[in-house]
Amino acid sequence: MSKLRLGVLFGGRSQEHEVSVMSARSVVKMAKKEKYKVIPFGITKKGQWVGPEESWNILNNGINEVKASKDRCITESVRVFLDHKLDIVFPVLHGPYGEDGKLQGFLDCLDIPYIGASVLSSAAGMDKEIMKNLFSYHKIPQARYRVYRQNHLENGLDGIISEIDRFLGWPCFVKPANMGSSIGVSKVHSPGEVKKALEKGFYYDRKLIFEEFVEGREIECSVLGNDQVEASLPGEILPGKEFYDYEAKYKDNKTRLVIPASLDESVIDKARNLAIKAFKAIDGNGFARVDFFLKNNGVLLVNEINTIPGFTQYSMYPKLWEATGLNYPDLIDKLIELALEDR
């Protein structure tokens, strides 16, 4: 029986480039060699596609940035990809240009099956404003928030500060609407810190989410499925910093993951059910990770959904499934099965 030709896309133009490389390194290592011919394709920060030989060199030698040995126009980049006649693609690309529906639409046009969310659900899961609107429509509990665009600054900061003071209070969080891995996020303790947080956030996006600060625990749940959806046991993040930012996620070894989380059975059941509900709210398919806040009074709030979560061997998504009874190589099998089923 011939092996399935599995393309693994990684790197990309987003600020989460290095995280993507680390995730892909785990995927190519753990995919079953007897079942798949793994063919990696790196994408540089400029959007150039790199062929398998160069990509293997990056993955096998601990290099965390994709660089092309020569400049390629878009036609050459696509040709590098198409020449390998892939059966399926795993886009291990986090953030804009990989997780937001653009790449998924490209693969749809090429009629190549791929793992994970569709164009629609990718876009909805990437844009926090759209995501939160969908959660509201489906009556999914979440933290209070406000959305601001750059044109809201035309009348100065006073109106924004007044609204935050009335509706959210201090401290609060400021987040770019279309970034992941907590890139560009600020914790704002007082009105005097708003200007700096806006400047930081608008560097990454044209609209920002202001979100109330929630005192409590950070819980995560992994989701898997198409029409029939299941959720893993939940895990807990114990950040070594004031909040779980990019440094805490990927560079600070003080952060601890508790898998599975120590929770009452009723909270576990509620987290799993809410994770599935959030997944269905964005019309999800394949896989996703859903993040929660567990308030000190026991109320569970959905924070966000990630349609291409971190996928290193040590990332929460695969570790939660391992704790639930599905190991990493079998998880890859299941994702491929779901992707082909969805065609």
Swiss-Prot record:
GO cellular component labels: cytosol
Binding note for cofactor: Binds 2 magnesium or manganese ions per subunit.
Residue ranges of every copy of the ATP-grasp domain listed in the record: 132-337
EC numbers for this chain: 6.3.2.4
Keywords: ATP-binding, Cell shape, Cell wall biogenesis/degradation, Cytoplasm, Ligase, Magnesium, Manganese, Metal-binding, Nucleotide-binding, Peptidoglycan synthesis
Keyword Cell wall biogenesis/degradation: yes
Keyword Acetylation: no
Catalytic activity entry: 2 D-alanine + ATP = D-alanyl-D-alanine + ADP + phosphate + H(+)
Principal cellular location given in the protein's record: cytoplasm
Positions bound to ATP: 165-220
Pfam families registered for this protein in UniProt: Dala_Dala_lig_C, Dala_Dala_lig_N
Leading EC class: ligase
The protein's annotated pathway: Cell wall biogenesis; peptidoglycan biosynthesis
Entry binding sites for Mg(2+) 1: D291, E304
Gene Ontology biological-process annotations: cell wall organization; peptidoglycan biosynthetic process; regulation of cell shape
Positions annotated to bind Mg(2+) 2: E304, N306
Needed co-factor(s): Mg(2+); Mn(2+)
InterPro entries: ATP-grasp (IPR011761), ATP_grasp_subdomain_1 (IPR013815), D-Ala_lig_Van_CS (IPR000291), D_ala_D_ala (IPR005905), Dala_Dala_lig_C (IPR011095), Dala_Dala_lig_N (IPR011127), PreATP-grasp_dom_sf (IPR016185)
Location within or outside the cell: Cytoplasm
Sequence similarity: Belongs to the D-alanine--D-alanine ligase family.
Function, in words: Cell wall formation.
Stated name of the protein: D-alanine--D-alanine ligase
